[in-house]
């Protein structure tokens, strides 16, 4: 087992400078070199040649270093997890609304928009009003009006027949 700093574990078989610079955010080659020099070690030393007291010195120096993120190393994974959770919430909302999760909606997803905006518009209300008034204005309205008229006539005839049957009994 190598040096453990917060949640990060450094590899024993590689040089400490390379591991520090690769694994810890905010540590470059020069900072890693200075940390190792402050701990009193040679720059090219590997992790398996360190004593526990030297490991503790390196960890203490890194935790006191002001240029780095706080002593809780490994926050990158937690931050990414938060971002993923927020993305999932957004996706859930989009799916519930019926919109696409990714991509444009200004020019794309027109079928969804059409389905959502289904309502009785002004044209259909006008047609209903004309039918009620009895004056169709165009060919389609006349067809509908004539069909309705025929249906009403059939109903009236059926009602008259049923009334005649009742009076005979």
Curated annotation (Swiss-Prot):
- Chief localization: mitochondrion
Q: Where does the record place it?
A: Mitochondrion
The segment annotated Disordered runs over 149-169
**One GO MF term:** rRNA binding
**Record SUPFAM superfamilies:** S13-like H2TH domain
One of the record's GO cellular component terms? ribosome
What are the transmembrane regions?
A: none
Entry keyword set:
Mitochondrion, Ribonucleoprotein, Ribosomal protein, RNA-binding, rRNA-binding
Instruction: Spell out the Basic and acidic residues composition-biased ranges.
Output: 150-161
- Report the InterPro entries cross-referenced here: Rbsml_uS13_C, Ribosomal_uS13-like_H2TH
Q: Which family does it belong to?
A: Belongs to the universal ribosomal protein uS13 family.
Stated role: Located at the top of the head of the small subunit, it contacts several helices of the small subunit rRNA.
**What does the subunit section of this Swiss-Prot or TrEMBL entry state?**
Part of the small ribosomal subunit.
**Protein name according to UniProt:** Small ribosomal subunit protein uS13m
The coding gene here is: mrps13
